[in-house]
Amino acid sequence: KGTPVLGVCGGYQMLGQTLDDPTGSESGRPQTLRGLGLLPTRTVFSEQKRRAQVKATVAAAPFAGAELEGYEIHTGVTEAEGEPFAHYPDGGREGCVQGDVFGTYLHGLFDTGTLTEALAGWLCRRKGIDPSDAALIPMEQYRRQQFDILADGVRGALDMDAVYAAMGMEKH
């Protein structure tokens, strides 16, 4: 009803019409479950897991052209009748889009920043906010800040002199 939805991996599968597990590989017994019905997709689970590093270009408006690098790790194959979320360099399609509902198998969507910026700008405009007023920082900078916060927390919780001594190192 006008609210954007993004499903990644299992979330993408659940946004579809059905999830078919003919061998019980995911659920422990053969069964077919109804999905949320927000995307025109059908997923069939299998014993084999797909693991791949991938690059793709977003096809879905309003993010079309954003370059992605990420990975897939999932069981099953999803057949999509809707528009693709992205295209692989070989022309293959990835994911599915219907209206403001987006589904993809690609983990790491927001690691490069191009999709993050496009998505944030789109959401700002939908809410009547000028994207240039939004305080966005590059993903790598954010990640470093979060690691610094984590490191400070670990240092505060440990006797670092004892840790350095146990490692045979001098305190820096």
Language-model regions, residue ranges each:
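Surface-exposed beta-strand edges and their flanking turn/coil or helix-capping segments
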Residues: 51-53, 83-86, 116-119
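Cysteine-nucleophile active-site neighborhood
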Residues: 1-60, 64-69
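Hydrophobic, well-ordered secondary-structure elements that form the walls
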Residues: 36, 73, 107
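Short flexible/disordered coil segments
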Residues: 27-33, 77, 168-170
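Hydrophobic alpha-helix feature that most strongly marks membrane-spanning transmembrane helices
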Residues: 3-4, 10-20, 44-47, 77-78, ...
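Catalytic beta-strand/loop cores that center a nucleophilic Ser/Cys/Thr
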Residues: 57-99
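Alpha-helical scaffold segments in soluble metabolic enzymes
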Residues: 14, 38, 72, 118, ...
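Acyltransferase
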Residues: 93-172
